[in-house]
Regions:
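Compact, glycine-rich, soluble single-domain proteins
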Residues: 1-35, 40-70
Length: 70
């Protein structure tokens, strides 16, 4: 497993684990980041990422991307 922040643009990944405190995991789940779900990195600039999850584009910071393991 590696953090989502290490994935390159255009790579579809399956979410294997979501770390962090309960409120962080709950927040990410509401955005569509769930274990077993697919996430694709659209772009990455200075550690901040735009990803496609459940058909929607979502911007997340590097700290959040580090909590999502693929």
């Amino acid at each position: 497993m590696t953090p989502l922040s290490m994935s390159g643009a255009g790579e579809a990944q399956i979410i294997k684990k979501i770390g962090g405190k309960e409120e962080v995991r709950s927040f990410l789940e509401k955005l569509g980041f769930v274990v077993g779900g697919e996430v694709t990195v659209i772009s990455e600039i200075a550690g901040n990422m735009i990803v496609n999850v459940k058909g929607a584009r979502v911007a997340i910071g590097k700290d959040m991307a580090n909590k999502i393991m693929v």
